[in-house]
Amino acid sequence: MSDTCDFSAFRSPAGDTVSVATRRGDPGLPALLEFVDHHRGWLQDQLATRGAALLRGFGLATPAQFEAAARAVEPELKNEYLGTSPRDALTPYVFSASELPPYYPIPQHCEMTFLKDPPRRLMFACLVAARRGGETPLVDMRRVAADLDPAVRGRFERGGIRIIRNYGGPSGAGRFDLWQLKRWDEIFQTTDRAVVEAKCAAQGVFTDLRWGPGDRLRLISEHEALRAHPETGEAVWFNHSQVFHLSAAPGELRRIYARTGELRSLALWRFAQAAVAAKRRLAASEDQALHCTHRDGQEIAAADLEHLRDVIWRHMIAEPWQNGDMVVIDNFAISHGRLPYHGPRQVVVAWA
């Protein structure tokens, strides 16, 4: 099998690398299953050192094929999802990566950092590559933690992260908000408030759960900014501040416009700036659909967030998808996101 694959790597501007195994023979699920079986040691080594590996040229074409491939890598797949991104279930263990509109950027994040037991492994496959854009960039969050200005990192370490979420409910009542991506019944897959409360209690991270008028739910949770990698002990930037902060969208769109020069991104950046300014005037932090502060309620300094985004983008590897690609990620080391795109795109995800 080794003579039918080429091994290479993609590189970030800061020198981070992601390993790539490209098949030269006929594609197909049997070839991918054989590769995983024969190269399990290589795959585990790449995950332990570089944190991710891309398997290219195997021609995955359906969610069912991807589930079989993901199960070959990690037999114990999971399917409970308490995240904020809209996703559709395609098989019992495969979901659409996100149902957000194509113009909407998804900032870098390790999956479900705000839960007690985040996934250990994350796997994506590209079944239909976008005509332009739509990359799923990867960032080594160990390198981000090490590269942060010590003063900025210290403020995050001392201050921690406090996530504020205000959800509408199954009645659909309440104000419209572009920052509210799901209702609470969609996240928890129930309309029973007692079940929601039990699921939140099981996580052990929520300091406030409050039901409000109009069928609304407020959740506040507290988290550390960094986490020690469970195998190496390395410090990892492991939180959602760069995703959930009110300024996340304009911060991402400005950098995307600088990268692509697309007028769509420029227009969306300016719109997001104006929308965020209006939201700040109209509602306190506690009432925002999605926002985060430090643990004591103090706002995170804008300059600290901008520095964090700069470091993340410097370590970003953003290679275009090809049809049939599959990437395996150590979720405790490597983050992912999504760049805007044009044309049809289908990227699917599984985790363990």
Residue ranges and their predicted role:
Residues M1-E34, Y103-I106, D117-A318, N323-I329, ...:
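Active-site environment of non-heme Fe oxygenases that use a 2-His-1-carboxylate facial triad
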Residues F58-L60, E111-T113, C126-A129:
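Beta-hairpin (beta-strand-turn-beta-strand) motif
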Residues E76-R87, T207-W211, I317:
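Polymerase palm active-site segment centered on the conserved acidic dipeptide of motif C
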Residues G28-Q46:
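Active-site-flanking structural segment that lines cofactor/substrate pockets
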Residues R50-A52, R56-Y81:
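Membrane helical hairpin/interfacial module
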Residues G41, A64, R87-D88:
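Membrane-interface amphipathic segments in extracytoplasmic regions
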Residues K78-C110:
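A gly/proline- and charged-residue-enriched helix-loop-helix capping module
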Residues L47, A53-R56, M326-I329:
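Beta-strand elements within well-structured catalytic alpha/beta cores of enzymes
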